[in-house]
Amino acid sequence: QALIGAEDAGRDMEAVRNALLHRFDENAFARVIYTESHDEVANGKARVPEEVDPGNASSWAAKKKSVLGASLVFTAPGIPMIFQGQEFLEDDWFHDKDPLDWSKKERYAGIVRVYVDLIALRLNRRGQTAGLCGQQIDVYHTDQRNKVLAYHRWQDGGRGDSVVVVVNFSTQLLENYEVAFPVAGEWKVRFNGDSRYYDPEFSNGGVYRCD
């Protein structure tokens, strides 16, 4: 509901926080994390972009919430799962006799790049985000009024390991908003889901200072 609700007032950051921290038998990898699955989008049920903006699954709001959902899936502790076509904003409900609309892969190439980049971060392919492969998470910033969460992911901690994820669930671009970091030192932005690199309609907002 935090993703697909029309009004910011209905987004419950405590519920999202609890979902991020939930695990079975103290093992983060005993659960699968997703926003779309066979059961969720089959038999006439809608996919996330369609739920966000019915009849206009390629709108700014639909794309933003799709990217936000993907960002959570690939940075939360657990086994990430995406459903076929999710990476290019497939909006039709799943039916095993209907093929995917592969033209959307080119039409929404920027959204596909979101998934490529998030998968690379999740797998620590550049040796900078090992924490996303680990068990540990600390949701240390929960702002119910502005609909912002920040959490620290780590495996052993330190350079090339610790990762901070900041997510804005609201429909507003927040300027001059400050979030503390868990430890002192130099931090670098590795992914900005609001970048126009991913979609020309995005605001290109993001972190201007990290220390």
Indicate where each model-derived feature is located.
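C-terminal accessory region downstream of the catalytic core in glycan-modifying enzymes
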Residues: P99-L100, K105-V112, D117-L123, E178-C210
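Conserved alpha/beta catalytic core and glycan-binding cleft of carbohydrate-active enzymes
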Residues: Q1-H95, L123-T129, Q136-G193
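A polyampholytic, Gly/Pro-enriched intrinsically disordered region
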Residues: I4-G5, R209-D211
